[in-house]
């Protein structure tokens, strides 16, 4: 755990979780107990209602009361429906007992329906009485079983309550002891460390602490402080010794520095003269660089304009290529549609041939019908007056056959024209498909040309970009060079100014060196006082 709060919350959470689990289990057991009690009440109520309705049947039979018998039978049916509804609440032996009572109750209702108040069959009456016990006994056995389950469930609830109370109390005690040890152990170690620090003991480390909470972090922080103090005091002790010895060397060194200051002053005068000469040369060089920079900037702008033009051309080529690709797809689609149209025309031509065959058949039938009509007319003429009616019918059949033949001839002519039109349409579709194929081939060629143009434009664009980048780099390099020369000129001017200032400062430094010698003596005395105070700490 990384914090005291998390440890406390964990302990409290575990206890709460145990209590919640205990509550849930108790609640579940109580619900089960309530279900058993409710089932027992339902069965007892059913037993009472059955007894009332059965008694009503017996009274109705004895008193020959049809109305009472009808209401009692209806009550038995209601009880049967209620008991059937209870089946979902039981299982195993209890369910078998309930089903046994239901079967006997159904038999009782059937027997009751056959009872006649005015003349009761004694065997039916006796069977009714027997069924009362057969219905009641399983229900009573079921109530006894529910009572046993109730007692068993109550004992289980008591055992569970005692068990969980013991477990929760033991867990709470364990968590309390564990949490207390985790909190107090690092506090004791921290107290020892702080006491040592208060007495100046820096060379004793804290005992190892495994806790990573706020107390552990505080202990580690104090231990880190001890280490830092130990390093600081050790460093101060060492530094004070070094300062004491260095102060003597500083006094001797200050005298040597005074002699060197005079030599440096003479060198600065010479450096000032050379700076004046270099400044004039750099001004001429700056003018040349500015002229080159102007030319490079003009080249960069031209290359950039050319790059923009090539980019626009490349975009137009991309758009044209995409448009050609769309045209190619549409050409392929149109070619497929032409092929489908040609196939449809071929099917239509085949259908026309089939219709023509059917028309020929109809024409043949019409001719045969005409011959039959002629034969019938001849036979009617032979029959004389008796065959006159038959002759009229034969004449109508002949006319109908001739009209059918004329109609089939017209249909044949129409089919012939339709066949010619279909053949012409098929030829046109074939010509169209051929033209579309040629167009698609031409578009593919154009697409290849545009693809070559696009590749060439990409190459040109790449080369122009390279030129533009080179001119920009050249322009940037010249600008940097110009800026560098300007800075160098400024530096020479500042150097000239600084050498003058440094010369006067060196004169002042010479006087300061004398004061430094006196300060070195005071520093040695302070180092001795610091050494005496550090002796309080044990390192």
Swiss-Prot record:
InterPro entries given in the database record: Chemotax_Me-accpt_rcpt (IPR004090), HAMP_dom (IPR003660), MCP_chemotaxis (IPR051310), MCPsignal_dom (IPR004089)
Residue intervals of the HAMP domain: 181-234
One GO term of the biological process aspect: chemotaxis
Keywords, in A-Z order: Cell membrane, Chemotaxis, Membrane, Methylation, Transducer, Transmembrane, Transmembrane helix
Pfam families to which the protein is assigned, alphabetical: HAMP, MCPsignal
Chief location category: membrane
GO cellular component, one term: plasma membrane
Compartments it resides in: Cell membrane
Signal peptide: none
Function (record text): Chemotactic-signal transducers respond to changes in the concentration of attractants and repellents in the environment, transduce a signal from the outside to the inside of the cell, and facilitate sensory adaptation through the variation of the level of methylation.
Protein name: Methyl-accepting chemotaxis protein 3
Organism the protein comes from: Thermotoga maritima (strain ATCC 43589 / DSM 3109 / JCM 10099 / NBRC 100826 / MSB8)
Source taxonomy: Bacteria, Thermotogati, Thermotogota, Thermotogae, Thermotogales
């Amino acid at each position: 755990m990384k914090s005291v709060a998390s440890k406390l919350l964990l302990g409290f959470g575990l206890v709460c979780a145990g209590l919640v689990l205990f509550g849930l289990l108790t609640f579940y057991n109580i619900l089960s107990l309530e279900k058993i009690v409710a089932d027992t009440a339902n069965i007892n109520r059913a037993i009472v209602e059955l007894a009332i309705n059965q008694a009503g049947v017996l009274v109705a039979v004895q008193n020959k009361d049809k109305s009472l018998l009808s209401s009692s039978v209806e009550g038995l049916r209601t009880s049967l429906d209620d008991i059937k509804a209870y089946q979902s609440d039981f299982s195993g032996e209890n369910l078998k007992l309930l089903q046994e009572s239901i079967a006997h109750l159904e038999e009782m209702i059937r027997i009751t329906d056959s009872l006649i108040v005015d003349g009761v069959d004694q065997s039916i009456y006796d069977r009714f009485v027997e069924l009362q016990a057969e219905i009641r006994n399983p229900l009573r056995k079921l109530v006894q079983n529910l009572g046993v389950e109730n007692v068993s469930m109550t004992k289980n609830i008591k055992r569970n309550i005692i068990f969980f109370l013991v477990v929760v109390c033991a867990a709470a005690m364990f968590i309390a002891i564990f949490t207390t040890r985790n909190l107090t152990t690092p506090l004791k170690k921290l107290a020892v460390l702080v006491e040592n620090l208060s007495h100046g003991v820096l060379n004793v480390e804290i005992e190892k602490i495994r806790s990573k909470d706020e107390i552990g972090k505080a202990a580690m922080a104090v231990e880190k402080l001890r280490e830092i103090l130990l390093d600081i005091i050790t460093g101060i002790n060492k530094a004070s010794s070094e300062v004491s010895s260095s102060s003597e060397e500083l006094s001797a060194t200050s005298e040597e520095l005074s002699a060197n200051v005079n030599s440096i002053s003479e060198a600065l005068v010479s450096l000032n003269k050379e700076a004046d000469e270099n400044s004039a040369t750099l001004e001429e060089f700056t003018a040349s660089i500015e002229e080159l920079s102007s030319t490079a900037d003009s080249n960069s702008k031209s290359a950039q304009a050319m790059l923009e033009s090539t980019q626009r051309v490349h975009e137009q080529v991309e758009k044209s290529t995409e448009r050609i690709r769309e045209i190619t797809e549409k050409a392929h689609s149109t070619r497929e549609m032409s092929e489908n149209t040609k196939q449809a025309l071929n099917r239509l031509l085949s259908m026309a041939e089939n219709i023509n065959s059917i028309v020929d058949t109809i024409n043949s039938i019409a001719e045969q019908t005409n011959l039959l009509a002629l034969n019938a007319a001849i036979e009617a003429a032979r029959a004389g007056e008796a065959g006159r009616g038959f002759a009229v019918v034969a004449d109508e059949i002949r006319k109908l056959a001739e009209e059918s033949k004329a109609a089939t001839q017209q249909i044949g002519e129409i089919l012939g024209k339709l066949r010619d039109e279909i053949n012409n349409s098929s030829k046109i579709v074939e010509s169209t498909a051929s033209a579309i194929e040629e167009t698609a081939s031409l578009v593919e060629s154009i697409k290849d040309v545009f693809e070559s143009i696009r590749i060439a434009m990409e190459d040109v664009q790449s080369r122009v970009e390279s030129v533009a980048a080179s001119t920009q780099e050249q322009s940037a390099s010249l600008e940097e060079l110009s800026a560098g020369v300007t800075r160098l000129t400024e530096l020479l001017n500042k150097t000239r100014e600084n050498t003058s200032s440094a010369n006067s400062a060196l004169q002042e430094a010479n006087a300061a060196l004398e004061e430094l010698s006196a300060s070195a003596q005071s520093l040695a005395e302070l180092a001795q006082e610091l050494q005496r105070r550090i002796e309080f700490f044990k390192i």
